[in-house]
Structures are given as C-alpha cells and as structure tokens.
C-alpha cells in the first residue's frame, strides 16, 4: 500500500513543499510510514477492544452495535482541520487523472468517505460500499459530538489526531517528527497495560465498574442533564458514597483560576497540609472534604441506574463528580469543577503530592471547617423555624430532609475521611455501613507507613450520635442501666489490647467487626430542628449529648482500644440489658421528645399516625429512650411491664373494648385531640362531661388553642369547648382568637371555629371579633372559607354592628351575585337584613339585571331566592321582566330553573301568562313543540303539567296528543310522552270519578 502510492503522495508533498531537499523528502517518507504503522496498530487495538467489550456485552444487544463501536473508534480522524476540507477532496484522492490511487479498504477507512458516500454529491457508482450502514453512521456522528469522557483509549485517540493539527492520514502536514509517533505508540501501549491492570484490580475487588473504556455500553457516554444529576442525588442513600470519587479526567484541572497553586501542588511546594488547604480554599473556595474526595484516585462510583447505556456516562462540565458531596460554600465554585481542565499534571504527580500530606492534620482541618459551617447553618435554621407556622413545616421537612441528612452526615463523619483516604476507599454511608476494601498492593504500603492510632478516626469518637442511642442505652438520663460505667470498665480491661491491633490478622478481624457492626447502625440524626419530621422505617431514640460520648471514647484521635470497645458494645447489644423493643410506629409519636425541647417550639409537631408534643413528663421519656437501638421493626407487640411504656393513644386505638374517661387522658390531651379517633372520643365525652372533667383537660388545651383551631381533627375539640364548655372556658378561648380572626377566617378549619364562636360567645366579644374583619370584607367574601364567616356575621349579629359589611356591597351586587361565593352572601343579605333602605338599594341593583342574572350559573340562585322567599311584588316584578322570553329562557340551562320556580311559586294569573306564552298563538303550537324536544325545555313542560289547574291541563294535553307519535322519535320527547300518558290515564279516571259523583248527587 505504501509502495504503490508513495510516488504520488511524495509528489503531492513536494508540490506543497517546493524547494525542499532530498533529506527532507526521506524524512517525510519515514514519518508517513510510521503514521501508517500507527494506523494499523490502532486497528488491531480496536479489534482487541471489541473483544473486551464483547465480554461485558448483553446478549440482547442489537446487531448494529459492533458497527457503531467501529465507527466511533474511527472518529479520531475528525479534527479541526476538517473545516478546511470538503467532500470534493475524496474525489481528487480517489481518482487522479483517471488512475485509482487507494485501495477499497483505504477508501473505507478514510475519515471523509462515509460523509461523501452518503451525501448526494458522489457520482462514481464504482465506489465500494462502506462498512457502516447509514443509520449507524448517523448515530455515530451524533454521539461523537457529545463524547467527552477521559479514558486511556480516548486520550490516546485525541493525541493521535492532534499531532500538528493533522486530522487524516491523507492530509499529513510537513514537520511531524518521527519521535512523536514513537512516543504516541509507547503511550498507547502503556495506556493499554494500565487499563488492563486496573480492570484486573477491579475484578479482584468484586467491582463492576468498567474503567478506561467509555463505550462499553454500546452507545457511548452522554452528557448528564440537571434533572439526571438531581435525580441521582435524591436516590443516593448516603452523604458519602460507598467509594471515594476522583476527577473524570486530567482535563478537570483546566479551570483552576491560579496556576501558581497547581505548580506548587505538583512540585510539593506546600510544607504542611494547612498551607495546602488554605491555598486551595482561597483559590477554589472548596472544603477539604470535597478536595480529598475529588483528588484521590479511587474508582469511579458505581452508577445505580438500571439503563445499560448510562453505565459509562460522565458528569457534565461544571459539576463535581458523582459521589463527591458539595457543601454550602462549594456550590458555586467547587474544587471538582475548578480542577476540571488542567492539562499539565498527571495522576502520578497528584498521588505523589498527596502521599506527602499529613492526613490526620488534614482531617482535623476538614472537621473544624465543616463544624463551623454547620454551626452557622444551625443558627440560621433556628431563627427561621421559630417563625414558621406549624402548617408549613411539613412541606419544609420534605425539602430539607435529604439535603440536611447528607450534609450533617458529611460533617459528623468527616473525621473518617483521613483514615478512609489513606486506605484508598474506606467510606462510611449515612446508614452506618462501613466499607473497608480488600488489601491491595497500594494499601499495603499505606498500612506499613501509617500510624495505626489513626484507626480512632473510624470509630464513634468522631461521630455525632446525638440520636444514635447505642443498643438502646440511655446516655442522657440518670435512671436505668448506665452505660458509662460499663464502658469505662471495659476500656480499662481492653486498654492493653490496642497495641496488638497492628498486625494483618487483627486488622482483618477489626475490618470484619466493623462491617458486622455497620449493619446494626442507623443513620445519624439530623439537625434537631428537623429531627421531629424525619419518619424513617427504623426505630429512633432521643438525642444524646455529643460531649458524653467524647468523654468516654476519647478525642477525634482516640486510641484503637476505645473504638474497638464501642463497636464491640454495638455488636453485643443483648449484654446491655433485657430490653423489649416497640414497633417503629411507637417511636414516631413518643410521649416526650428531647428534639422538640431543644427546638424550643411551642407547637406540637405531626407524625404519620398521631401527634406528639414536647410538654410530656420526663418520667415517661426516661423509659422510652431505653429501647434497643436495633429495635424490632415492624412488630406490633409492646410489653407494658417492660422499661418501654406504650403510648396511651396507641393502646386506646388498638384496644377497642377498653373504656377511658377524660380524667384518664390527662397529659395526653393534645395527642388525642390531633388524632381522628382521639378527637372523636373527646367530643363525645365533652357532651356529657362534668365541669370537673372539663377543667381537668382544659389547661392542656388552652396553650395550644390556636394550633388546634387549624388542625383537621383538633378544630372539632375547640368547637365542642365553645359549645359545651363553661362560660369562663369560652371566654378564654375567645381571647385566644383575638387578633387572629382574619387569619383563622381564611383557613379551612379555623373558619369553622370562628363561626362556632360567633354563635355562642357574648355580644361584646362578638363585636370585637367582627371588628377585626373591617377592611378585609371583600377579601373574605371572595375566599372559599372566609365567605362562611361573613354569612355567619350577617345571620347572627345586629345590623348596626355589621353595617361596615353591608355598605361594602353597595354598587357591587351584580358582581357579587355572579361570584361562586358572593352569591351566597347576597342571599344571606336578602334573607336577614330588614332595613328598608338597605333592601331597596340591593333590590334595585338586582332588578336592573334580572335577565342577565337568570342566565348566569351563579346569579340564577339569587333570582330563585327572591322568587321563593321574596315579597309578592318582587316576585311579580321578576315574572313581568321575564315575560316575552319564557320560551328562550326555558331552553337555557340556568334560566330554565328560574322559569320552573316561577311556575311553582307564582300566582294563578302569573302562571297563566307563562302557559299562554308556551302554547303560542297558532294551532301548530310551535313554542310548545320546541320546548318538548329541548333537553332543558322538556323539564319546564313537565313542571307546567304538574302545577297548572284542570282547565289549563286539559288544554295542554289536547295540544300534546297531536304530536305524541312524533315525540317518541326524540330522546327528550320520550320523557314528555311517558308523563303525558300517565296524566291522561289519571285524568280520565278523575273525569270519570267526577261524572259518577255528579250523577249520584242529581235527584
């Protein structure tokens, strides 16, 4: 191939480089031969890569995947120089003076051949068909544009085509050194060898990641969208992944703002990890947690998506790698993003620099940094939560649960990162799972050089287990089994054992112990402000002071013996006492919650099945906090005689035969009031309760009066107290309402309490309550809840006290009458306001728009109300305004109801006017026929047959009989036919009966 086309190629090169000597031409020849050899090497490497891929390829993969991979391998030939060529170059290469210069295989491998062949410009029918179908070629082109994953093959591919901006074997530019081609070939071999060794390592470790080959999925990588990244973040169950992550490629260093930082980093210019941390923090604004997670060359975290084509996809530019937790300070400029585009530093340089870092000092810096951030966030959250209504906290819980959980876990377990990083990939999940990988050649050296006392950073001394009540042991109360003494005695007993944990056997034993204990641990508790909203499937306990645990287990750099003892105690939880576990629902609504006390919130917080609140007695919480940490999840059995005391509400709901009295639920009134069954129990008891029983539970109700008023079940308890409570209790509850009438009136459940209060409280308190609505009357009228309060004010209060409400309706009667809620208010005004002047003003506005309101979906109710409940002259005036439009109104959906009301409540004369208009003035009775066939008019005709007198009935029946057969063919006419036949039968009987009676009375 080289010898056949060498002369022509050399002539082309000579034409480009006129004036070059023979030595230069010989050098070009050698370079061309080396490039062709490199091309053949790439072909063989591509075949080897395909064989590797076939091992992991699914048996159901489509047959075109192999061709697609081949096309993607060929994309390395496309470079920026493709912009300077066009498809016509193929023709010049293929045919020059009628002589074919390239073989069929060479043509097929040409980078422009596919686009030329599948375009409409080629005119040579003898061109060999390409190896790739048109569909596969299009897919390859599309995926080539989005391919941006670093791997040994991809990096070699880039460097192959970037030699002096050359993008094709057939467009070689002069000046390419032979040494560069040899270096590329050696780099390729090294990359392949390194990729194989990495794959063998991953297989030994039982991993499924395919490092180094981004196209294993068959479709190559695709750029993640924001939705993908967000979804993966929500699905992750740990703040730290099961593996430490690393940058997707060396290109992740490119965006570093200060090149001097990287130069010092690469050269080992930092004398201490503090200097290294400060420099990175000032440059990239990133915490050490993200820095370590981004720079350690641990495996890429496993992708959890079930889609096979997503296995090899990479993170988008500007986002940290998946598995790296981003803190608040890092969100806009993370270190993972800042180092994404560096080209000058290799992984070996980074690893060499990191190996010189003091990991214990770095972990301490990281812990201090994260704790300072958490302190600020906790203070901010504390301020916010004090002013958030109880109703809004439930939504806030859903927004902050995952984020707060991951962030706090990252901070609390931050001390483990030093040890975990030194081992390579030792991590701790948010569920307490400790993953320590198998010992490898790299970890062996770290074992031999690291200080084994750093094992303490993996233990519980550096973990905030405020709610992680170990094995149900109560660390915060004086009663029960005191684990402090037990831990101290065990610590003395095993203190000599710490020096024996340095051997390989003991390390393996410790690893096994850690993994066993990890299965027993649960996720650490979140910020106390949010802990009451987290309903996990596992049992939880009350918070524990972190300082108590630190005092027993030592500092963050505690010795190995204490950590070993902590894990030993967690594993052997049965030795700490014979404790019975309640089900998980019991802990979702404890009688007492230290988290709520710490919160300082005066409102009870909801749970799944019932409500809990914070003013329960300490004696009840002491026993509850002693339930084993592991718990018996899903069990409904509760041993009342044990140290765990069952909830009174749960016992009441589970035991239907048990009878309780109000005096027995003292201390649990709020919990009962906010439960469906408990609220119903209190309501029933209040109806027949004595004053003593009411006074026994009312002191618990009063402090949470406004909270219960807006609760779905608690509002009924407040209403019952307004209805059946003593005068003093009603007054005190009314004082709770003062200043909040408008807000409660606009609330779904609060509006019911306001209505009940307006019915029973004294007039003076009624006046004060209604006065708070001044200036917001129209807002309440247009509200689905507030309109009921306005109606109650109109019904219950004297007109002098609510004149500000009535006067706000003047000039707006038509608009209010056509409003879904305003029409109800206008009806109450017409019904309860007796003032003549007020009635006149309202009726004038209504009479001016009778026909409009009669046809409106809401206004027709106002007209019907006047016809049914209004004065006779008002009804006659409305019928007169409708006269002449009866047939039209009868065929309208809403106005037909008004016509029926006129026939029902109108006088005989008014009714006769309507009947005459329906019959018409001809013998054909066209209006009557049209009404009988109409979906709405037929009901008006039926109402006429029900309400008219005998004379009118006989006349109408005689007219209908003529059209009876025709009506049977119409859907709505059938109703008339059935009604007429029934009336005819009834009428004939009535006529016959009348005739017989007349004959008997004749002498």
From Swiss-Prot:
Q: Which UniProt keywords apply?
A: Cytoplasm, Phosphoprotein, Repeat, RNA-binding, Translation regulation
Pumilio-type repeats, residues: 664-699, 700-735, 736-771, 772-807, 808-843, 845-880, 881-916, 917-958
GO molecular function annotation: mRNA binding
Q: Does the keyword S-adenosyl-L-methionine apply?
A: no
* A GO biological process held by the record: regulation of translation
Locate the compositionally biased regions of type Basic and acidic residues.
Answer: 46-57
Entry's localization field = Cytoplasm
* Polar residues bias spans: 285-300
Q: Which stretches does the entry tag as region Disordered? A: 38-65, 285-328
Domain PUM-HD per the UniProt entry, residue ranges? 644-984
What domain comment accompanies this record?
The pumilio repeats mediate the association with RNA by packing together to form a right-handed superhelix that approximates a half donut. The number as well as the specific sequence of the repeats determine the specificity for target mRNAs.
Main role?
Answer: Sequence-specific RNA-binding protein that regulates translation and mRNA stability by binding the 3'-UTR of target mRNAs. Binds the APUM-binding elements (APBEs) in the 3'-UTR mRNA sequence of CLV1, PNH, WUS and FAS2.
Report what the protein is called.
Pumilio homolog 4
């Amino acid at each position: 191939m080289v010898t056949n086309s060498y002369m022509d190629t050399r002539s082309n090169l000579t034409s480009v480089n006129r004036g070059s000597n023979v030595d230069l031409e010989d050098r070009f020849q050698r370079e061309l031969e080396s490039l062709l050899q490199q091309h053949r090497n790439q072909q063989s490497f591509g075949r080897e890569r395909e064989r590797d891929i076939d091992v992991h390829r699914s048996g159901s993969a489509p047959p075109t995947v192999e061709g697609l991979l081949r096309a993607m391998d060929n994309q390395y030939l496309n470079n920026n120089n493709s912009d300077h060529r066009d498809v016509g170059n193929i023709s010049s290469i293929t045919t020059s003076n009628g002589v074919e210069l390239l073989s069929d295989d060479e043509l097929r491998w040409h980078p422009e051949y596919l686009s030329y062949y599948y375009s409409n410009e080629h005119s040579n029918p003898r061109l060999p068909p390409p190896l790739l179908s048109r569909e596969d070629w299009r897919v390859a082109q599309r995926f080539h544009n989005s391919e941006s994953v670093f791997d040994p093959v991809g990096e070699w591919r880039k460097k192959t085509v970037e030699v002096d901006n050359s993008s094709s074997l057939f467009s070689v530019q002069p000046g390419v050194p032979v040494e560069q081609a040899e270096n590329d070939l050696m780099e390729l071999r090294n990359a392949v060898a390194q990729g194989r060794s990495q794959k063998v390592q991953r297989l030994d470790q039982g991993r499924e990641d395919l490092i180094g080959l981004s196209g294993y999925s068959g479709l190559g990588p695709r750029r993640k969208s924001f939705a993908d990244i967000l979804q993966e973040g929500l699905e992750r169950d740990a703040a730290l992944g099961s593996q430490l992550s690393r940058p997707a490629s060396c290109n992740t260093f490119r965006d570093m703002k200060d090149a001097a930082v990287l130069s010092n980093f690469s050269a080992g210019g930092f004398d201490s990890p503090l200097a290294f941390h400060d420099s990175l923090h000032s440059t990239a604004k990133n915490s050490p947690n993200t820095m370590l997670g981004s720079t350690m060359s641990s495996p890429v975290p496993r992708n959890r998506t079930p889609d096979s084509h997503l296995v090899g996809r990479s993170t988008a530019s500007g986002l940290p790698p998946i598995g790296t937790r981003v803190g608040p300070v890092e969100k806009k400029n993370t270190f993972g993003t800042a180092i994404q585009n560096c080209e000058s530093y290799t992984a070996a340089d980074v690893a060499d620099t990191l190996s010189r870092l003091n990991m214990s000092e770095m972990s301490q810096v990281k812990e201090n940094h994260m704790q300072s951030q958490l302190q600020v966030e906790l203070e901010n959250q504390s301020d916010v939560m004090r002013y958030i209504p109880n109703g809004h906290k439930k939504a806030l819980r859903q927004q902050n649960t995952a984020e707060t959980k991951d962030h706090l876990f990252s901070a609390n377990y931050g001390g483990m990162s030093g040890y975990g990083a030194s081992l390579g990939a030792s991590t701790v999940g948010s569920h307490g799972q400790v993953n320590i990988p198998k010992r490898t050649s790299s970890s062996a050296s770290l074992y031999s050089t690291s200080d084994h006392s750093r094992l303490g950073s993996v233990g519980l001394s550096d973990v905030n287990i405020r709610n992680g009540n170990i094995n149900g042991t109560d660390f915060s109360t004086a009663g029960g089994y005191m684990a402090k003494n037990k831990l101290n005695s065990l610590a003395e007993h095993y203190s000599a054992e710490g020096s024996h944990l340095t051997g390989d056997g003991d390390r393996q034993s410790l690893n096994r112990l850690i993994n066993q204990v990890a299965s027993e641990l649960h996720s650490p508790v979140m910020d106390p402000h949010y802990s009451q909203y987290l309903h996990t499937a596992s049992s939880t306990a009350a918070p524990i002071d972190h300082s108590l645990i630190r005092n027993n287990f030592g500092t963050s750099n505690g010795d190995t013996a204490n950590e070993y003892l902590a894990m030993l105690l967690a594993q052997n939880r049965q030795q700490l006492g014979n404790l019975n576990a309640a089900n998980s629902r019991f802990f979702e609504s404890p009688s007492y919650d230290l988290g709520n006390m710490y919160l300082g919130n005066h409102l009870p917080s909801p749970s799944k099945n019932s409500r809990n609140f914070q003013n329960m007695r300490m004696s009840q919480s002491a026993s509850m906090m002693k339930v084993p940490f592991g718990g018996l999840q899903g069990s409904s059995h509760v041993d009342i005689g044990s140290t765990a005391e069952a909830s009174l509400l749960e016992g009441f709901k589970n035991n239907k035969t048990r009878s309780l009295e109000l005096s027995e639920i003292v201390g649990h009134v709020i919990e009962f009031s906010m439960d469906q069954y408990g609220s119903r129990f209190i309501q029933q008891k209040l109806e027949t309760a004595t004053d003593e029983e009411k006074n026994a539970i009312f002191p618990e109700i009063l402090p949470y009066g406004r909270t219960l008023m807006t609760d779905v079940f608690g509002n009924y308890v407040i209403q019952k107290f307004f209805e059946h409570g003593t005068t003093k209790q009603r007054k005190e509850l009314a004082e709770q309402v003062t200043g909040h009438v408008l807000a409660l009136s606009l609330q779904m459940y609060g509006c019911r309490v306001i209505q009940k209060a307006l019915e029973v409280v004294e007039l003076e308190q009624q006046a004060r309550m209604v006065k708070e609505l001044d200036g917001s009357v129209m807002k309440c009228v247009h509200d689905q809840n507030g309109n009921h309060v306005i109606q109650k004010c109109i019904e219950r209060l004297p007109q002098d006290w609510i004149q500000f409400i009535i006067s706000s309706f003047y000039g707006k009667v038509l608009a209010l009458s056509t409003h879904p809620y305003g029409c109800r208010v206008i009806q109450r005004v017409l019904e309860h306001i007796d003032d003549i002047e007020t009635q006149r003003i309202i009726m004038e506005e209504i009479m001016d728009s009778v026909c409009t309101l009669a046809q409106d979906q809401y206004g027709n109710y106002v007209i019907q109300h006047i016809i049914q409940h209004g004065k006779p002259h008002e009804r006659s005036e409305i019928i007169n305004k409708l006269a002449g439009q009866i047939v039209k109104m009868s065929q309208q959906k809403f106005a037909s109801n008004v016509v029926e009301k006129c026939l029902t409540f109108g006088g005989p004369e008014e009714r006769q006017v309507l009947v005459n208009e329906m019959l018409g003035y001809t013998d054909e009775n066209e209006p009557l026929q049209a009404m009988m066939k109409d979906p709405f008019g037929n009901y008006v005709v039926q109402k006429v047959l029900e309400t008219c007198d005998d004379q009118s009935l006989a006349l109408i029946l005689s007219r209908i009989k003529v059209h009876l057969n025709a009506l049977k063919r119409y859907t709505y006419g059938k109703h008339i036919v059935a009604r007429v036949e029934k009336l005819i039968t009834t009428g004939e009987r009535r006529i016959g009966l009348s005739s017989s009676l007349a004959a008997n009375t004749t002498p």
